[in-house]
Regions:
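Hydrophobic transmembrane alpha-helices
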Residues: 2-68
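Membrane-water interface at transmembrane helix exits
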Residues: 25-29, 49, 54, 88, ...
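Interfacial aromatic-anchored transmembrane helix boundaries in multi-pass membrane proteins
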Residues: 51-60, 83-114
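Membrane-interface helix termini and inter-helical loops of multi-pass transporters
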Residues: 1-4, 153-165
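Hydrophobic alpha-helical transmembrane segments
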Residues: 11, 36-41, 78-82, 100-105, ...
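Short helix-perturbing small/polar motifs within transmembrane alpha-helices
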Residues: 103-148
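Alpha-helical transmembrane-segment detector that highlights a single hydrophobic TM helix
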Residues: 61-80, 84
Length: 170
């Protein structure tokens, strides 16, 4: 679900990049020294999981692990995912350098949302297997939702692409 450079309007790219930069700055300010190794491992997991592709009809899907990263890292997900996205953009050509802030928001914001959902008392009362499924599903769902919304509001010609992406991913 990487957005390449030049796909979005400059205004959308700038606004979402600023939001991502603020979130990243907050994550840097609150991370504890003992959380750094776990953040590094989560970043490596995110990077490596992107290599595992599963054929699905006319397309393919790959693991993103947003729910897992989110429940372990919370707001520090912005740090782990940014490092992995930079490596993916520079080494593999996934996404782009200019759109990295948008891709960070699409990936890290759902991880933080899942973290907060997982902390609720109601969510903790759900059967463990269902809860684990929901952690994975909700991470992918929110990432898809953010991607679709960003495409939809960026350019009118992306409206049908946004609907297609939502249909394939959900």
């Amino acid at each position: 679900m990487h957005i390449a450079d030049g796909v979005l309007t400059p205004e959308i790219t700038a606004v979402i990049t600023v939001v991502s930069a603020i979130a990243f700055y907050k994550a840097i300010r609150i991370i504890k020294e003992e959380e750094i190794p776990l953040t590094a491992v989560a970043s490596a997991m995110f990077f490596i999981a992107s290599f595992i592709h599963i054929p699905f009809g006319v397309t393919q899907i790959h693991l993103i692990l947003l729910g897992v990263i989110g429940i372990f890292l919370g707001f520090s997900s912005f740090i782990a995912i940014l490092i992995a996205l930079i490596l993916q953009a520079l080494l593999l050509g996934y996404g782009g350098v200019v759109s990295i802030g948008v891709n960070l928001f699409i990936m890290a914001a759902p991880a933080v949302i899942v973290y907060h959902i997982n902390k609720t008392e109601i969510f903790q009362k759900i059967n463990e297997k269902i809860r684990f499924f929901l952690i994975g599903f909700l991470g992918a769902f929110f990432a898809t939702l953010f991607l679709v919304a960003i495409l939809y509001f960026s350019k009118a010609e992306y409206e049908w692409a946004a609907y297609s992406i939502f249909g394939v991913n959900i």
